[in-house]
Amino acid sequence: MRPAVAARFLEFTRPLEGTVEYMYVDVKGLVTIGIGNLIDPIGVALALPFVKKVGGAATPAEITAEWTLIKDADNSKQLKTKGHTACTALTKLKLTDAAILDLCTQRLSSNELELKKVKEFKTFDEWPADAQLAMQSMAWAMGGAFAAGTLWPSFRAACATMDFDGAAANCKMNESGNPGLIPRNRADIHLFKNAAAVLAGEADKYYNRDTLYYPLVLLKPIVITP
């Protein structure tokens, strides 16, 4: 991953996800925390350094009890339809800012490893920074293995040849029931189109792959022939 992507990823994704220090459930009923970090199943939560809002470390029993409460498995509280603020008064535990940053850093790295297992993404390290950020954005929303197996065939085929215009045309995630994906989809399309412009212009030194140009809108060089 290019340094600019690692350095600016949270700046990019935080406005799309928000930052929540306590457990809540997303629209799918999955327990989440931080900047859109899934901690479901419970084993993921138990590995984290939760502390009490009033101070002091949380015990495994306290983490388990709160996770179970927020999971709302029978949907009696209908938390997944109410947003994270509905869980504020229900929670007594939290993660510190440092713990959230560490969790996000680990997830970004693990997503990259998963992405590179897909044969069409093997050249990921060669991609322009804007394309890498778009791919990490999709992985943040769907998981690093989102394109494994036979999933996303048209998108994978475009990425295999670094056809980032094709990637832009085939990267849209399903927004049904999850309107929060609308701005992320818009950003990802923008990023892939930028990456296509970078490849088109790099030979003439208009652009370079290490630079993350987003949120600028890049244009491909215009070739004028007599």
Question: What are the residue ranges of the model-derived segments?
Answer:
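Acidic, aromatic-lined catalytic clefts of primarily extracellular/periplasmic carbohydrate-active enzymes
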Residues: M1-Q132, T150, D165-P226
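Acidic helix/loop microenvironments that form the catalytic cleft of cell-wall polysaccharide enzymes
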Residues: M135-G144, E175
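Short conserved catalytic/interaction loops centered on acidic-Pro-aromatic/His motifs
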Residues: W127, A145-A158
